[in-house]
Amino acid sequence: GDHRDLHTAYRRQRQMCIRDSYKTEHHTVKGFPGAQDISNEALLELDVDILVPAALQAQITGENASRIKAKVVTELANGPVTPEADPILTQNNVLVVPDILANAGGVTVSYFEWIQNTYGYYWAEEETYEKLEKIMKDAFHRTHEMFKKNEGGITMRMATDMVAVEHVAEAIKVKGWA
């Protein structure tokens, strides 16, 4: 794939529509009209509502976590927030949606495809999206509830793990294995 934009950061006060033909024509967002070239470090530290690190690991570290101004960090890359940064962000009231939760959509849709292929089902695209939205929202709400229930003592990542363990334990009980 084309990785030219991995180390490129741009800021634009107004909405920046990357679906624009510019990316297609130039194969990069570099030089996007009206966008200001900034460092990746500056991008991470912008005063924004939601920050979505989506390309590289270890972007938010123990060193820069205290400078993150976003209210929410949604990890679309694998491991963009380091273990050292996670508690710092939580302490600073930055809600981190961990990669294992934020990235679960792709695996979930793969499961839907498996179900359809195995049992000969066909779901329209809209129905697939509705099922995915329900599962993702439920997973987020269960995780966030676990986080709030243990407020101050755990991170959202820990809450995600705790919900997963609870889910497995419940499945073991239902199957009569325990």
Provide a role label for each language-model segment.
Residues G1-R14, I18:
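Single conserved hydrophobic/aromatic residue that forms the stacking wall/gate
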Residues H7, E41, A54, L132-E133:
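Short acidic-aromatic active-site loops that bind/stabilize oxyanions
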Residues H7-A9, L44, S66:
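Generic structural signal for beta-strand residues in well-ordered domains
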Residues Q13, L46-D47, K69:
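Alpha-helix C-terminal capping/helix-to-coil transition sites in glycosyltransferase folds
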Residues R19-N64:
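A structured beta-alpha segment of the ubiquitous adenosine-cofactor-binding alpha/beta core
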Residues S66-A178:
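Adenosine-phosphate binding glycine-rich loop
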